[in-house]
Design a protein with these regions (language model features):
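A short, flexible loop at the N-terminus of ABC-type nucleotide-binding domains that lies
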Residues: 10-20, 26-39
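Helix-to-loop junction immediately C-terminal to a conserved catalytic motif
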Residues: 68
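ABC ATPase nucleotide-binding domain "signature" region
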Residues: 51, 150-163
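Conserved ABC ATPase signature
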Residues: 138-142, 146-147
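Conserved ABC ATPase "signature" region
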Residues: 23, 109, 116-134, 194
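The feature captures the beta-strand-to-loop junction immediately N-terminal to the Walker
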Residues: 53-55
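Conserved ABC transporter NBD signature motif
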Residues: 75-85, 121
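Short coil-to-helix segment of the ABC ATPase nucleotide-binding domain corresponding to the Q-loop/switch region
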Residues: 98-105
Length: 263
């Protein structure tokens, strides 16, 4: 099967924001080849919050890179019906010489927005993440949680289009809160849910934390150990601390890890 990944979003279905069919990703060749993903199928609906869980090395980050267009699948197809995906990583990766507002403006500038529009939209997004008063500050003047809020505002800015077209937005998040302390992480999870509900952005969120996945996801998807493929899905209730569901998913994750170790 040949690999296909469109340079510009292609209509898959009015009810599908992201569609992956039989996706395979192999690094290297011959005896040194490593298969990160194999036969992975996944759907994300417009405005849906999907959490990806799995053991280290199962291909979660690889999957995000493929959806973002940062890499190409070795086989299978990936179809998007969204604006260009925005990516948020564990590190905020803000430009240290730019203010918070200018960091948020950067993707808008690259997208062709005029100066006045950039400033207005950056101010609006900083207000959305509750940082309306820090636009003039540089990253070193902000706490870790505040820097991640700025990074979130910048990611949301990256989903905007200068032509004003109302394409569904897609946010790809690779363990964005993993480096934060427990209290700040809890606050950021709540803030992300608030922003998600107010914007209707589809989210594909990678995490190792089962509790985080259950709290955030409308759907929790478990990947097998490498090579990664979907082995189980659960429906979630965002904002709800469901101890029973957390225990069930944790037990299944342990089974996946144990079976891989035994093999």
């Amino acid at each position: 099967m040949s690999a296909t990944l469109e340079d510009s979003p292609r209509l898959a279905s009015t009810e599908v924001a992201v569609k992956l069919d039989g996706v395979r990703k192999v690094y290297g060749r011959g005896d040194r080849a490593v298969t990160a993903l194999d036969g992975l199928d996944l759907r994300v609906a417009p405005g849906e919050f999907v959490c990806l869980l799995g053991a280290s090395g199962c291909g979660k980050s690889t999957l995000l890179n493929l959806v973002a267009g940062l890499d190409k699948p070795s086989a299978g197809s990936i179809e998007l019906n969204t604006s260009r995906p925005a990516v948020m990583f564990q590190e905020a990766a803000l430009m240290p010489w730019l203010t918070a507002a200018r960091n948020v403006e950067l993707p808008l500038r690259l997208a062709g927005f005029g100066r006045a529009d950039r400033r207005a939209k950056a101010a609006e997004l900083l207000e959305l993440v509750r940082l309306g008063g820090v636009g003039a500050k540089r990253p070193h003047e902000l706490s870790g949680g505040m820097r991640q809020r700025v990074a979130l505002a910048r990611a949301l800015a990256a989903t905007l289009r200068v032509d004003g077209a109302d394409a569904p937005a897609l946010l790809l998040m690779d363990e964005p809160f993993a480096a934060l302390d427990a209290i700040t992480r809890d606050v950021m999870q709540g803030e992300l849910l608030r922003i998600y509900r107010s914007t209707g952005t589809a989210v594909l969120f990678v995490t190792h934390d089962v509790r985080e996945a259950v709290r955030l996801g409308q759907r929790v998807v478990l990947l097998s150990s490498r090579p990664g493929k979907v082995v189980r899905e659960w429906a979630g209730s965002p904002g709800v601390e469901d101890a029973e569901l957390t225990d069930e998913i944790t037990a299944r994750l342990r089974e996946v890890i144990s079976s891989h170790a035994a093999g």
